[in-house]
C-alpha cells in the first residue's frame, strides 16, 4: 500500500525547468525537501531544491543513487526514457503512473485511449511510410496536421498540410518517423482543465481556462473561460473520467478545442501544466501544491477560484518587460531565472487579477 509522507520527507523530481522549480517551491511550503535530477547545468529548479543531481537519463548508477535518496519520484515533463523508469521503480514509487506516461508519450495511443473512453478527438490516421501518408491524406483530406507520434511540444514536430503539399518532401522533412495525421478542427477557441486525483481517489478540478496560442506556444490563459454552464461541467467531468480510468495520482492538464459548442480533446499532459499557472494567484491552493499533496498521500486542498485572472507568458525577449511589470502593482510576477534568452523560450509569466 502506498505510504503517506510526512513533512521532512524528500520528493525527487525528474526535470529541473520552471515546472520543477515551482513544484519545489510548493513542496517547501509544506515542509518537504526536493531533489532534482536534470541533465543540464544550473537549471531553474536547482536554485530552490535541497538536492541536485546533474546526469543524463541513461546514467543508471546516478539514477539509482538519486532514487534511493528520495521517498517518492515525480516529473515535470513526459518524455522520460523507459529505462530510467525501470531503474527508479526498483527503489521507490513514481507518480503519476507509468501507464499515464506511456499513453501521453505517443499521440496515436493517446487518441485511441480517449476515443475508447467515448470522448471526441480530431479524426486521425496512423502514418508509418510515405505511401501511408498518401493514403491518410486521401482519407482525411486537407487542411490537416501531420505530427510526430513522440517528442512533440510547444508546436514542435508538426506541420500543417494543404492541397499543394508534397507528401514525399513532408515525409522526409519529419525524419521518416512514425507519424500521425490529424484532420483539421475548425474551432472557435481552446480551453484546458487542470485536474487532480489523490491516492484515496479524491478528485478536484480547477475552473477551465481559455487559452491563446501563437506559433504553437501558449501565450495567455484567461479564467473564467468563455463556456456555457453545460460545457464547463462536461469539461470537468471528462477530466475526472480520464483521471479515474488511469487510476491517476497527481495533477493532469487536459486540453480541448471548442468547435460548434462541442468539446474535442486535443491532448493531455500527465503533469502540472502551463495553462494552470493562473491558480498561483487565483486559488487558495494552486496546481503545484495540489500535485505535491496528491503524490504525498495527503488530502487535496481547496482549489476553488476566488477571482478572475489572466496569465501571460513572457516568451524570449519579452522578459525585457520585467521592469515595467515590477512597477505595475496589479500583477504578480513569476520569473524563472533563466540566463539565456532565446526565441520561443519561456522566461517567466505574470498573473493579472481582473476582478
Regions inferred by a protein language model and the residue ranges of each:
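Phosphate-binding core of ATP-grasp and ATP-grasp-like enzymes
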Residues: 173-227, 232-265, 269-277, 289-302, ...
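Active-site nucleotide/adenylate-binding loops and adjacent lid/helix of ATP-dependent enzymes
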Residues: 103-192, 196-242, 355
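A conserved FAD-binding loop/helix module that cradles the flavin
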Residues: 280-281
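Short glycine-/aliphatic-rich beta-strand segments at the starts of folded cytosolic domains
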Residues: 305-314
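A structural micro-motif
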Residues: 32, 50, 92-93, 119-122, ...
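Extracellular/lumenal mucin-like low-complexity stalks
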Residues: 313, 318-321
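An anion-binding loop in the catalytic cleft
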Residues: 341-354
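ATP-binding N-terminal substructure of ATP-dependent carboxylate-amine bond-forming enzymes
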Residues: 1-109, 131
Amino acid at each position: 500500500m502506498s505510504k503517506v509522507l510526512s513533512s521532512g520527507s524528500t520528493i525527487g523530481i525528474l526535470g529541473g525547468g520552471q515546472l520543477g522549480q515551482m513544484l519545489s517551491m510548493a513542496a517547501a511550503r509544506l515542509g518537504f525537501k526536493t531533489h532534482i535530477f536534470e541533465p543540464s547545468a544550473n537549471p531553474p529548479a536547482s536554485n530552490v531544491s535541497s538536492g541536485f543531481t546533474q546526469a543524463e537519463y541513461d546514467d543508471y548508477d546516478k539514477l539509482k543513487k538519486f532514487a534511493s535518496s528520495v521517498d517518492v519520484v515525480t516529473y515535470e515533463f513526459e518524455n522520460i526514457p523507459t529505462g530510467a523508469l525501470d531503474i527508479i521503480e526498483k527503489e521507490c514509487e513514481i507518480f503519476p503512473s507509468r501507464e499515464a506516461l506511456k499513453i501521453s508519450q505517443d499521440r496515436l495511443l493517446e487518441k485511441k485511449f480517449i476515443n475508447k473512453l467515448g470522448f471526441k478527438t480530431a479524426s486521425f490516421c496512423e502514418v508509418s511510410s510515405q505511401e501511408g501518408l498518401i493514403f491518410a491524406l486521401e482519407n482525411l483530406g486537407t487542411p490537416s496536421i501531420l505530427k510526430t507520434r513522440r517528442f512533440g511540444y510547444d508546436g514542435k514536430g508538426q506541420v500543417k498540410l494543404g492541397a499543394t503539399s508534397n507528401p514525399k518532401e513532408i515525409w522526409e522533412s519529419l525524419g521518416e518517423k512514425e507519424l500521425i495525421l490529424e484532420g483539421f478542427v475548425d474551432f472557435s477557441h481552446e480551453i484546458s482543465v487542470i485536474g487532480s486525483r489523490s491516492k484515496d481517489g479524491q478528485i478536484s478540478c480547477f475552473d477551465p481556462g481559455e487559452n491563446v496560442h501563437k506559433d504553437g506556444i501558449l501565450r495567455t490563459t484567461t479564467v473564467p473561460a468563455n463556456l456555457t454552464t453545460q460545457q464547463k461541467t462536461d469539461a470537468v467531468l471528462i477530466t475526472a473520467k480520464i483521471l479515474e480510468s488511469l487510476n491517476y495520482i497527481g495533477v493532469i492538464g487536459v486540453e480541448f478545442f471548442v468547435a460548434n459548442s462541442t468539446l474535442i480533446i486535443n491532448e493531455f499532459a500527465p503533469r502540472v501544466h502551463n495553462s494552470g499557472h493562473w491558480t498561483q494567484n487565483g486559488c487558495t491552493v494552486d496546481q503545484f501544491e495540489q500535485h505535491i499533496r496528491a503524490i504525498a498521500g495527503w488530502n487535496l486542498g481547496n482549489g476553488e477560484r476566488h477571482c478572475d485572472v489572466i496569465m501571460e507568458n513572457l516568451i524570449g525577449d519579452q522578459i525585457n518587460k520585467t521592469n515595467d511589470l515590477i512597477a505595475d502593482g496589479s500583477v504578480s510576477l513569476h520569473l524563472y531565472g533563466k540566463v539565456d534568452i532565446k526565441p520561443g523560450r519561456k522566461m517567466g509569466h505574470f498573473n493579472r487579477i481582473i476582478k
